[in-house]
Amino acid sequence: MTKKKLPVRFTGQHFTIDKVLIKDAIRQANISNQDTVLDIGAGKGFLTVHLLKIANNVVAIENDTALVEHLRKLFSDARNVQVVGCDFRNFAVPKFPFKVVSNIPYGITSDIFKILMFESLGNFLGGSIVLQLEPTQKLFSRKLYNPYTVFYHTFFDLKLVYEVGPESFLPPPTVKSALLNIKRKHLFFDFKFKAKYLAFISYLLEKPDLSVKTALKSIFRKSQVRSISEKFGLNLNAQIVCLSPSQWLNCFLEMLEVVPEKFHPS
């Protein structure tokens, strides 16, 4: 009798079978009986089966047709589980607060991050994500060259909980993995400005080797740059990529106040 193999999809999905990892992911996400939780790339339902015991509502999102059928049979009697068969990039993300606990398809990590931490900024509360180690480590570089990474750190506390070995998955991946915890910060920010804020970051990072002083002078007057430096404790001689997320946000908010809109980056 031939042993049935689990499918390995083009998106790089590897199924979590480590019960300790599953327990830690759920604990780190601080799930309550009031939460709606998305399980992106639900696979065989190894995470979903634990989430449904805690969360108010679990949405298991899976793109593999055979696995979608399996999930629907497995959770046919679970009133708080909704199985959605689609690529997460085409999924209608909730317009209300939600969390994510997921072992995501590694191949679409960047897209998932953008959907959660940029497009869904107003409703994504955070959670736990198991993903490839390399892109996780890039989130914690001392110098941030990627505008989206600056954006994510502005609005979320990101924590690399620990590295995860290949033996925690079926089939075992050839790359190292990690457990990432995400918590949204409590900031007073009008989310209608999120695209403008990203444009502001992107504009100033076009020449990442410029000093903070030189980069800011492309938007602010010389006297305004000096004032901003004193107000927010900026090192004007440091590279622009060395600004902290809070300094980025403060500079942006200052631009909204003192720079005419026609001079704002777009």
From Swiss-Prot:
A Pfam family this chain is assigned to: RrnaAD
Record-level Gene Ontology MF annotations: RNA binding; rRNA (adenine-N6,N6-)-dimethyltransferase activity
Record SMART domains: rADc
One of the protein's GO biological processes: response to antibiotic
Amino acids binding S-adenosyl-L-methionine: 14, 16, 41, 62, 87, 103
Highest taxon listed in the record's lineage: Bacteria
E.C. code: 2.1.1.-
Keywords in alphabetical order: Antibiotic resistance, Methyltransferase, Plasmid, RNA-binding, S-adenosyl-L-methionine, Transferase, Transposable element
Function: Involved in erythromycin resistance.
NCBIfam families linked to this entry: Erm23S_rRNA_broad, erm_F_23S_MT
Record family assignment: Belongs to the class I-like SAM-binding methyltransferase superfamily. rRNA adenine N(6)-methyltransferase family.
Protein name: rRNA adenine N-6-methyltransferase
Species for this entry: Bacteroides fragilis
Gene: ermF
